[in-house]
């Protein structure tokens, strides 16, 4: 891209190479006739030339690498892009903390049980990281109720805390009378989000610019949904052609991490439908991206030449499971390729996908012996319907 900006300067007649700048300086010096000692052997002339040429070269390079690219939305970044976004009423979305509920189960329902604010619920170690939720308010589980939801918030901001059901199930400090704790399906009421990236803000800018007339088309709905939700605009998918009758359309929302819960969907629908942010005659409803479930079998082979103890084997198996789950958006702690709607993972593409994943597993977890494990994973309904999908390494 920098070559394009360099070409722009060259076409305008501005020298961009050091030799060109030197030649231009020498030409101007000769025209003025103020300096006669211009021998290449002269220390004075070499000093004057360096003083004139080097700063111009620095400024030219900075102009090509920083100034010109940041004058255009497509190539601008950070504060420069922020200034561009201000022109259409946008700004970087700040990082937010995940909020939701975790269910506490009592040992007995014959008495009340109080869960104090500040109680911590955490995950097992996922790729050497432990995620924690904190109870936000004191909650009483009354007599006669065995299990009840307790409001929680993530320890830190970010999308990594939007884990799937079952990850948060450990109390680092035991509570008398509590037999179990777990985040269930639909536990998220407000997903956490990372600070918006340059590319994500650029996409929202493009959407905002295309919807400047405020006609209620896809770009407008994408803009308003992305504003209220912890989503980038490319995670919002529309179904047109009146799926629920004339004037109707559906929007399907996809989180980068975790499952899009119904309380979160309800929040977005209230904003779009009940608070007046829809067009005349429009009928748009947001849904979570539909899912199907498939059994995947993963075979882990440990190298016979390397001794691996039973405890370490179990750790490796757990890490491999978490890595595979990351590909299906249940966590965000591994650099694996994610599944996306309208992406077919069958036949050759499926094999290629698992070849890549297998290579990453091999690089991350070497070992000994053989181990097989079957896991249940999420897959999107856009994929071809299959009762089972098996990949082996």
Swiss-Prot record:
Transmembrane segments: none annotated. GO terms for cellular component: virus tail, baseplate. The keyword Oxidoreductase does not apply. Keywords: Viral baseplate protein, Viral tail protein, Virion. It is found in: Virion. The keyword Zinc does not apply. PANTHER family: PHAGE-LIKE ELEMENT PBSX PROTEIN XKDT (PTHR37829), PROTEIN JAYE-RELATED (PTHR37829:SF3). Putative baseplate protein. Belongs to the P2likevirus gpJ protein family. This is Putative baseplate protein gp29. It comes from Haemophilus phage HP1 (strain HP1c1) (Bacteriophage HP1).
């Amino acid at each position: 891209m920098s070559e394009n900006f360099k070409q722009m300067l060259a076409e305008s007649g501005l020298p961009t190479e050091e030799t060109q700048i030197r030649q231009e300086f020498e030409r101007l010096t000769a025209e003025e006739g103020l300096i006669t000692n211009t021998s290449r052997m002269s220390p004075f002339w070499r000093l004057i030339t360096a003083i004139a040429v080097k700063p111009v070269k620095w400024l030219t390079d900075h102009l090509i690498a920083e100034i010109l690219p940041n004058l255009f939305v497509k190539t601008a970044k950070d504060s420069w892009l922020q200034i561009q976004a201000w022109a259409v009423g946008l700004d970087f979305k700040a990082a937010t903390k995940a909020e939701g509920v975790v269910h506490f189960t009592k040992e007995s329902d014959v008495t009340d049980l109080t869960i104090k604010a500040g109680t911590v619920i955490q995950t097992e170690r996922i790729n050497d990281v432990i995620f924690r939720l904190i109870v936000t308010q004191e909650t009483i589980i009354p007599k006669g109720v065995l299990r009840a939801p307790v409001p929680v918030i993530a320890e830190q901001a970010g999308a990594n805390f939007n884990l799937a059901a079952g990850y948060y199930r450990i109390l680092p400090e035991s509570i008398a009378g509590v037999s179990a704790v777990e985040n269930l399906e639909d536990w998220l009421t407000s997903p956490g989000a990372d600070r918006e990236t340059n590319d994500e803000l650029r996409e929202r800018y493009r959407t905002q610019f295309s919807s400047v007339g405020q006609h209620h088309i896809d770009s407008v709905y994408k803009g308003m949904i992305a504003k209220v939700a912890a989503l980038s605009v490319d995670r919002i998918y529309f179904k047109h052609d009146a799926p629920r009758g004339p004037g109707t359309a559906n929007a399907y929302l996809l989180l980068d991490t975790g499952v899009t819960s119904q309380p979160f969907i309800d929040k977005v629908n209230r904003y779009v439908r009940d608070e007046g942010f829809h067009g005349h005659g429009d009928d748009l409803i947001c849904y979570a991206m539909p899912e199907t479930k498939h059994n995947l079998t993963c075979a882990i082979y440990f190298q016979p030449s390397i001794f691996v103890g039973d405890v370490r084997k179990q750790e490796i198996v757990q890490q491999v499971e978490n890595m595979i789950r990351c590909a299906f958006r249940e966590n965000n702690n591994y650099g694996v390729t994610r599944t996306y709607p309208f992406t077919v993972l069958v036949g050759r593409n499926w094999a290629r996908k698992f070849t890549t994943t297998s290579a990453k597993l091999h690089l991350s977890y070497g070992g000994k012996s053989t181990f097989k494990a079957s896991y249940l994973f999420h897959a999107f309904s856009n994929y071809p319907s299959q009762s089972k999908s098996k990949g082996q390494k």
